[in-house]
């Protein structure tokens, strides 16, 4: 078969490399809340390495920093805001109840 007539070849598309979430100057520390909060979900869970796009070493340091911040109560262990939010209350209709004797 002729190599020039390959039916299933994909065209190569150029792609932009994403910027790393942690620059070389950033210190992964429990006090650096602006950095740590990027790696926590809305529920307060630590995001995975694939989602964060960080190296294994960086993920370990992030995890340790988040756990230290939780112990020192800089971060909450759980972030369940919905549990405590009150929904729109409907006004109760007060009706006079008659007692049956």
UniProtKB/Swiss-Prot annotation:
Biased composition (Basic residues): 1-19
Stretch list, region Disordered: 1-23
GO MF annotation: an example: structural constituent of ribosome
Highest taxon above the source species: Eukaryota
Keyword field contains RNA-binding: yes
GO BP of this protein: translation
Chief localization: plastid
Gene3D superfamilies the UniProt entry points to: Ribosomal protein S18 (4.10.640.10)
Gene Ontology cellular component terms for the protein in this record: chloroplast; mitochondrial small ribosomal subunit
UniProt entry keywords in alphabetical sequence: Chloroplast, Plastid, Ribonucleoprotein, Ribosomal protein, RNA-binding, rRNA-binding
Pfam family of the protein (one): Ribosomal_S18
Localization: Plastid, Chloroplast
InterPro entries per record: Ribosomal_bS18, Ribosomal_bS18_CS, Ribosomal_bS18_sf
Oligomer and partners: Part of the 30S ribosomal subunit.
PANTHER family the UniProt entry points to: 30S RIBOSOMAL PROTEIN S18, SMALL RIBOSOMAL SUBUNIT PROTEIN BS18M
Record-linked NCBIfam families: S18
Record-stated family: Belongs to the bacterial ribosomal protein bS18 family.
Record-given protein name: Small ribosomal subunit protein bS18c
Recorded name of the encoding gene: rps18
